[in-house]
From Swiss-Prot:
Recorded family membership: Belongs to the bacterial ribosomal protein bL19 family.
Protein name: Large ribosomal subunit protein bL19
Provenance organism: Desulfatibacillum aliphaticivorans
Swiss-Prot/TrEMBL keywords: Ribonucleoprotein, Ribosomal protein
One GO CC annotation: cytosolic large ribosomal subunit
Amino acid sequence: MDVIKQIEQEQMRYDLPQFEAGDTVNVHVRIIEGTKERLQAFKGVVIAKKSGTTNATFTVRKVSYGVGVERVFHAHSPSIDHIEVVSRGKVRRAKLYYLRKLRGKAARIKEKRF
């Protein structure tokens, strides 16, 4: 078992910011097209976060041209360049799947005050 834990520790990323469900994040992903490499930003609300060692994931949702788009990111993936936390959201749930059914202003999340 120690070998598995050692491999997992080598692949972990420790430069990720702290964010929770309800936070608006901007995820910069490396896209490789042929020999070229570029960064693509995906800005949206974190609706779910699954913790774990190397298999930790988080789901980000945004509405693009009236269509809801969700993307699941592996937190320790080398294809993620960096993550910016744009704003903190005030929510009472760990999973915000109910946002899928809401439209317009009802789908907004209040910003957390400090």
